[in-house]
Amino acid sequence: MWIPTEHEKYGVVIASFRGTVPYGLSLEIGDTVQILEKCDGWYRGFALKNPNIKGIFPSSYVHLKNACVKNKGQFEMVIPTEDSVITEMTSTLRDWGTMWKQLYVRNEGDLFHRLWHIMNEILDLRRQVLVGHLTHDRMKDVKRHITARLDWGNEQLGLDLVPRKEYAMVDPEDISITELYRLMEHRHRKKDTPVQASSHHLFVQMKSLMCSNLGEELEVIFSLFDSKENRPISERFFLRLNRNGLPKAPDKPERHCSLFVDLGSSELRKDIYITVHIIRIGRMGAGEKKNACSVQYRRPFGCAVLSIADLLTGETKDDLVLKVYMCNTESEWYQIHENIIKKLNARYNLTGSNAGLAVSLQLLHGDIEQIRREYSSVFSHGVSITRKLGFSDIIMPGEMRNDLYITVERGEFEKGGKSVARNVEVTMFIVDSNGQPLKDFISFGSGEPPASEYHSFVLYHNNSPRWSELLKLPIPVDKFRGSHIRFEFRHCSTKEKGEKKLFGFSFVPLMQEDGRTLPDGTHELIVHKCEENTNLQDTTRYLKLPFSKVIFLGNNNQTMKATKESFWITSFLCSTKLTQNGDMLDLLKWRTHPDKITGCLSKLKEIDGSEIVKFLQDTLDTLFGILDENSQKYGSKVFDSLVHIINLLQDSKFHHFKPVMDTYIESHFAGALAYRDLIKVLKWYVDRITEAERQEHIQEVLKAQEYIFKYIVQSRRLFSLATGGQNEEEFRCCIQELLMSVRFFLSQESKGTGALSQSQAVFLSSFPAVYSELLKLFDVREVANLVQDTLGSLPTIMHVDDSLQAIKLQCIGKTVESQLYTNPDSRYILLPVVLHHLHIHLQEQKDLIMCARILSNVFCLIKKNSSEKSVLEEIDVIVASLLDILLRTILEITSRPQASSSAMRLQFQDVTGEFVACLLSLLRQMTDRHYQQLLNSFSTKEELRDFLLQIFTVFRILIRPEMFPKDWTVMRLVANNVIITTVLYLSDALRKNFLNENFDYKIWDSYFYLAVIFINQLCLQLEMFTPSKKKKVLEKYGDMRVTMGCEIFSMWQNLGEHKLHFIPALIGPFLEVTLIPQPDLRNVMIPIFHDMMDWEQRRSGNFKQVEAKLIDKLDSLMSEGKGDETYRELFNSIIPLFGPYPSLLKKIERETWRESGVSLIATVTRLMERLLDYRDCMKIGEVDGKKIGCTVSLLNFYKTELNKEEMYIRYIHKLYDLHLKAQNFTEAAYTLLLYDELLEWSDRPLREFLTYPMQTEWQRKEHLHLTIIQNFDRGKCWENGIILCRKIAEQYESYYDYRNLSKMRMMEASLYDKIMDQQRLEPEFFRVGFYGKKFPFFLRNKEFVCRGHDYERLEAFQQRMLNEFPHAIAMQHANQPDETIFQAEAQYLQIYAVTPIPESQEVLQREGVPDNIKSFYKVNHIWKFRYDRPFHKGAKDKENEFKSLWVERTSLYLVQSLPGISRWFEVEKREVVEMSPLENAIEVLENKNQQLKTLISQCQTRQMQNINPLTMCLNGVIDAAVNGGVSRYQEAFFVKDYILSHPEDGEKIARLRELMLEQAQILEFGLAVHEKFVPQDMRPLHKKLVDQFFVMKSSFGIQEFPACIQASPVHFPNGSPRVCRNSAPASMSPDGTRVIPRRSPLSYPAVNRYSSSSLSSQASAEVSNITGQSESSDEVFNMQPSPSTSSLSSTHSASPNVTSSAPSSARASPLLSDKHKHSRENSCLSPRDRPCSAIYPTPVEPSQRMLFNHIGDGALPRSDPNLSAPEKAVNPTPSSWSLDSGKEAKNMSDSGKLISPPVPPRPTQTASPARHTTSVSPSPAGRSPLKGSVQSFTPSPVEYNSPGLSSNSPVLSGSYSSGISSLSRCSTSETSGFENQANEQSVPVPVPVPVPVPVPSFSGSEEPVRKESKTPPPYSVYERTLRRPVPLPHSLSIPVTSEPPALPPKPLAARSSHLENGTRRTEPGPRPRPLPRKVSQL
């Protein structure tokens, strides 16, 4: 039976449990579990990491831990009762673990490794804490390290700042908010501004001396030197080096490294230097022989200097090499370091070029104990300590020092009867009172043990030597008296014996007879002469002699012979026990000299403070002893001396001696009667404050009042103890009188000088310190009343000095911080006074920082004592006194401008944060009763309204992101909890007082605005938190967003009809709330939109405002990253609210607006789909197809469905930027054209918008044109750039702006040059299908055609797509996927290459048009693409597989042509047809014939550098050894069985026969051309081909071609053999008449096409000038199955996605035209190395017209590109295939016309061209040999651009939604008198007829500029009849106050729209393509 657990509540899993048993809970080792129940060795509970899943697990798998349970029962919470630091470490490491792995994923390697080390270090420290064997100090140290590392890691990972108290986390509920703020602020400040250490230390380590001439031992002496004061500031660090320049004792680190300690900040200056003096130990002269002298001398060697400035910039451990300078003149040795510092080192030599002193230096900061801990490794090995000279900046009590520093300065000696000066050495001894030398009390420096004697270095031949060597003598105090120092002087001989001869001595006693030590300073000692054998051991013999010249001269002792020799030393005593001051000694011995007491007390102020604190206790005993002796006589003097000593301890240098005085007062003070004299004298001074002129001394007294009161209180206590409490009332009266005097002087106002206010300030500064002393003698209430009266006596007039006001407030602050205030009884007495002064200061906005600090302390105390009843009353007082002023203060300080300086800004933030914390503390402490009293306190509704507005405004300020640092989440959550609690209280007041007739819009709007920004706070978005953090927040506060959302809904429902005031203003804010991914919040808020729509419908009959606001706000919000897929679905769920059973509003008639409501929601939902896709795509770093496609989708949606033109323009520019970033310059130009189309050439002013300045519409359109042209240029789309150049040139021309017109014409010319000169790569096109539900909405289950990048083939494109969609699966087949793929929760990509089908064939079929021009039209403006799949139908014939080889042809039609505003567009329609084997054969032959013609033509015109391609092509067709050649087609389709079984294929069989004959004719001519150009080594192959050709021709039954179509032996520039069609065996017309069109084989037309009025087709009446009609310019013969002749083989590479289906090609691409619709495009062969396609023609029209051949003039009939085949037969044109001479005949269509380049003319009028037109120009029935002026079938580019020209463009239709009309894509058929009305499927729509321009004609002898007319590009930009009816967005336009100036007339003559023969062209009707297109879709 399961029993709830009592104690087993919390445990850690010690072994993983799989949970395979029923109801088992899977656990991993290390998981923590909360246990709910137990049963027979099993527990039931849950893992804390996933509390929603409960289950059972074995009890043996869990280690139980102690825990406390809060809120026992169903919602109990278990907290482990372990060290809080351990708990924090555990939870933090878990959070870090997840984030640490993410660092690796994000490739943040540096932080990854650093965090790994820190985590390991924390784990090690955690083990140490858990073991529990650490000492208290060590545990504290470990916790400090742990928290420091936790804080570092949290900061690096962007986690929250953790508030801590003594290394433990604090619960915000357990402390006041003000205290929480202080903890956070302290940790934040500590993090931002590291504490500056007051103490610094320099670590020095000697490495080696590098010098070439070593060989003697050296002494190296380091010291710190102040170059500013020219003195050393530290002791010396002394070390010895061996002969190699290395430390002599390497095993003793303390001998070669030292720490210069206690350097104050004043010592860290640039003029502090490290000086190094090097002394050698050896011979007198460096060059002497080794054995010359056995005696060793100390001799100067060198000096080095280093400035400490290099160390101030940063800590360095790098080794430094110091230059060592040698002294040339030994007499200057004492100042060599000064000269080097002064840069006077030119007089010194370096010890060597490579010489130097290698040292390591490091500057350390902090207390010496802290340094010992942090650098324990250094101290554990040993390091010597080098002190400062003298005391440190701060003298600590108990510090014992007794160091006498002696500097051996210099000497003056006589020659001693010698011709040269002496070599003097000084030896020093310390001799005690018994005449015995003191052992080991002479220190040369740290690092060297003390010695018993000292030997100076020797200066060679110098009678005035200067040594300046510093020595320390650490002599014990008890050895000082009677001891002296003896200096012995010896001459050092340089002879072989090297003996040292004594010639004199000096001495100096350490202490005088009166007990004073040797005074500091320089002393000139007498040198007493003596002999070598003089016995100096008997000190009594010389101690009677004078030792100093000063004493000697003073005594005027004539008995002693005067001496010229002297010796100077400098002494400095650093002692805590001995003194050199006689006045101090006189005071301490006052009883022996009672007559000197007055003088001694007066001189006390002149004694150095360090001397006084050394004898502090003795001095105080002396003073109170004198007071007891005669208080009447010495009372005032003793009082003044006491004041001086007390104030002396205020100095920072002696501050640490205050505890010494406190100890004295408590333990040693015995003046039981002193309180009377102290009170008396103190009152005397206070009474005279108001009268005294000079108050400096009085202020000194007031400053010392704290310790005076301590003495008074202690004295009274001693008296009470001694007398049993006598005179108590008398004492109380004295204190009362004293404080009354104080209150009187405090109440006085300062007059004139302000000295009184200064005295008041001094008193107030120290008065709070008296409280604790008074409490020792008086009751708490008594003291509180005394303090209240004293503080209440302060003047409240605000014109008092600001300094006094500040001091007064500081006094209030100290009062609040005092022990007195912590008592509830006293606090209730003092609180009104405190609040009164605070109110005054806050009202004047003065001393805000101090006010905030005081308030913080007040609330800290209230929180600590919140359980007491008195606290509620205190809250009442504070609310009544401060709440209003506190709100106003916060509003005031937050509205101030930010300070410029960082310090002021930091101060501003501090004071703001403290006031905010105070307000929050007050509100949190308020109960229902307090809120009720507060609301009832307002007498009028206006006051309540002002208060509510004020507090709502403050709340909005409090939740600003910048209010607290970003990592203060704890503080933010506490603040939000207080705010929402307060709002819930205040919302009732809002409902009760401001509804119905009292409705106030402003206060309700403020409320809703506050609620919205509250919910939207970043710190409340729990979804962004880690699971553990989210769990903690929910457990403590719940989801405050939902609470506030419910409150919003409730308040909204209370508004009633007043809701209309907030529509549509609140739509945006509420929408922002609903975008938060919190289901409960969304469920509450989304129905409000339904309510808004309902009320808006009631008011205005529609909800357009709601709709507009929703859409506008949705875009901006979702762009900011808000909203998700779930929100879209939830928002869509509003639709059921419009059903027959609504859930909210039941009275409205739903049917009136249900439909529009559903439509709105559906529209918004679709917009969200696109916005979500857009946002997700924008998160990707690089620009890819997804980003661009998504932007296009959103752009189109704004235009077509929402008609939001401003948003449309914004997304145009976003798309433009994406294209530029991806270097899609062509697409960028098309994109910008969308905006260009919305503008007109007008002078309407436009506002600033995006990056555009304020300018006119004309200027902006000009700028756009130039930008677009530039992008077309960069994208190598020069043809489109030419059109825009012409358009903008028209504008320049109309304004007579010839300068810019010239530039534009030159730009246009440069584009023509680029077309002809630069190479352009033809891109591949790929069809991509996106299947599956995991794709974005704009791609899901759709298919697109994509334009590939340069050089990008199928494999590369497929890999790129898979990289963009890494989770997608590539489908390996080209079949249509089934429904399961469409609905799959996955991503499937289907990719294969497709062939572009150019819509306009006119340029492609023109003879003589360069390939550079044609290549553009093959792959631009493409709407249709094709893909062929071969298959066998029926039984497959093994002998001839072509009999059953069918082709499935798929045609894809796009919504827009490529290229366009994107590199890919969606497939709008797909058509699938099957091509029969016969149709396939026809297409293959047509393609091969076309290929042959092209190669022959290129060879003739020498475009081909190499004849090999032609050779291979001829060889492949004639010698078809692979698949059998065309004979396989004969076997398959010309046999009787096939003809009888397929009677419907008669025409097709005839066509196939005709193509075979045509191929033979082309081959014959090709061989003739080949023979002319074939190189000699290829002649045998050529001969073989000729022989095989005759065999092949005979197989066709052809002996010779008819005379009229024989191949010409003469070479023509564009020549090709003519085609004979009368050799076809089948009759092609009902009457049996054979129509034979005369044409060049290179302009061979296919049979005529049926005209189609389909909106998506090109002019069906067009026929090709190059080959039969083809739907692809690329795939010419891709359908070639493997096993037949090579006559159809191709050199082109085949498409990889189809199999072979033509007789001779190894690769295949099925390419036949549709069977169900008529083909609309004509194309030519593509020069690209890619699969080419054949063309499937439609059947020939039965009624053919006769062709009248006129051989004589060499002209063959010319095809008009706009006529069907039979119509083209009537107009013969010159042909290069004629049998005439090489002269090319003039085309009749060129007669009478100017010839222009192949670009469209600049239109002067706009038109709306139609698909079909009827020509009004009759055509002659026959060809006349005379050259006359005949109407051209191809309009000239110079005359008016007929619709036939402009309509061929696939770019000229536009979206009518844009408000801009444009031409539809169409083509015009200009016939020659014969109409094929049977083919027409639509009636032309009449439109206005343009007037033609008169065209000059040429006479018969005149030649036009060009030999033949060229067809311009089949499109024209900017041809439109109507300007845009949709105006520009209002936000972008400026109202025009006056009409713009009229445009000047154009300089060009008006162009006539009449034709030359007087007839008028019939304007074509519009071609009704389903989606009209725009200029931007060029």
Curated annotation (Swiss-Prot):
Region Disordered, annotated ranges: 1657-1738, 1751-1978
Residue numbers of Phosphoserine PTMs: 1608, 1616, 1623, 1627, 1629, 1640, 1778
Disulfide bonds: none
Modified residues (Phosphothreonine): 193
Motif SH3-binding: chain residues: 1797-1803
Functional note: Functions as a guanine nucleotide exchange factor (GEF) that promotes the exchange of GDP to GTP, converting inactive GDP-bound small GTPases into their active GTP-bound form. Involved in regulation of adherens junction between cells. Plays a role in cell migration.
UniProt remark on domains: The DOCKER domain mediates interaction with small GTPases like RAC1 and is required for their activation.
Family membership noted in the UniProt record: Belongs to the DOCK family.
Protein name: Dedicator of cytokinesis protein 4
Species of the source: Mus musculus (Mouse)
